[in-house]
Amino acid sequence: MRNDYLVNDSTGKDTLTQAILELIEKSRSNIKIANFFFQYKGVVDAISRALDRGVAVFVLSNIRLNRYGEKSTKAELQNDTTLFNLTELSYSGAHIGLLNDLHAKFLIADSKEAIVGSANFKAASLKYKSESGLRIIGGDIRALEYVFETLYCNADIKSFSSSSGRHALITQTSVTSINKAMLENSRMRFTIVASNSYRNADYHSNLPKDKEAGVISIFQSILKVVETAKEYIYIVNWQFKALEDLSELFDALKRAIHRGVQIALVSSVGDAKAINQKAVDKLIKIGCKHYGHKNNHAKFALNEHSGLLFSANIDGESGLLTGFEVGCMLSQSERSEAVRHFQNLVGECEQTKDRQ
């Protein structure tokens, strides 16, 4: 039986990576793909082969022009090959759109099958980090495809390559509007809100500025998981940050603890340790258990009867409240697989000592 909950882990299990590559390889008509990075050679090469067999490829990414601008270092530009790879794909016929607030990670093939998840297209994410993903078929794809097409048409930057070999990044200004009716009766969840950075003169975002932009948000769905829990809450993420800007979530977690719900958290103590520490200490203080994992980048939230998987960090500054992120509610079988994933992660961790 095919498992639609997909995992990469530090033991070498790579069902998510293999599912991504297989979905690109079997595409025949079109691919719509969004990711924060396009560095992993296996994915880039698979997209190139799809272009060679006549598949129409549409890409949404974020080359972080706000980060790699005048102050960028040579090392930063050399280490992040995303712009180079997207330029090469554009030369080969891919249609490239760039969003300054994109952090979502998903792939749609032939409007029939999709994968959403936590993994960036980087070697670390696709080879040894713990990552979570979900294979999607059926009606939910329509909502995901609608959002992709809307944001692609209103991308902050379009990438153009001419037959003469010239390449250009063209900024465009438009107003993105989301039709809520297109997302109803779907398991898909989103964040689609311009970050506060758009207020800076040198930052541009075509995403809606309104936090009530017509989507069922990832944040509200996480809150519902917390508020409806009676036995336990498991939250797995790369980082916990800026909880002062997530007061609704923090207060909901406190109320859950007061009604006897057991709360366990997993986050990275590798590349995100310094970012995590302040927020983790606050969560431990109110009664949460925290497990630090060296290589975790998986992202999901569960209770005993519901859950969702998503691309966003638990970060009050970016992701849950602003930016472009994608998530999906879990079926009961998928939730059970996510519980097993959580248990495996905890088995690889050492519980953080109580710092009260």
Model segments located where?
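Charged, low-complexity intrinsically disordered terminal segments
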Residues: 1-95, 101-102, 108-356
